[in-house]
Amino acid sequence: TDKHRIVFPTKSGFEVIQANSIVYCKSDGSYSNIITIDKEYFTSKSLKEINDIIIDSNFIRIHKSYIVNKNYIKSFKSDEFKLDLITGESIPVSDTLFSKKKLIDTISS
């Protein structure tokens, strides 16, 4: 939902982010990077904690190191098992978590 806000601790305090502005989240050791349309945030929350906070059906844990917002997916490269995002970035998909069919079903639902 558009009103869904998420609060993340940062080095200097905390940030309030609209869930729908998050493109993807990436694990960085025990920390995480939250990438939005216009900014990147660094938080002490783990990817699992972020996954538990984001209770939005538009987000998929596609890899042990990535959570992606379905609204920003442009295409899937099955030869590389990567998703291309509308931001121009490419992120990996775990072939142990997803078959091509399961990925299509998950993205379409």
Question: What positions do the PLM features span?
Answer:
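Basic, polyanion-interacting recognition surfaces, primarily
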Residues: T1-S109
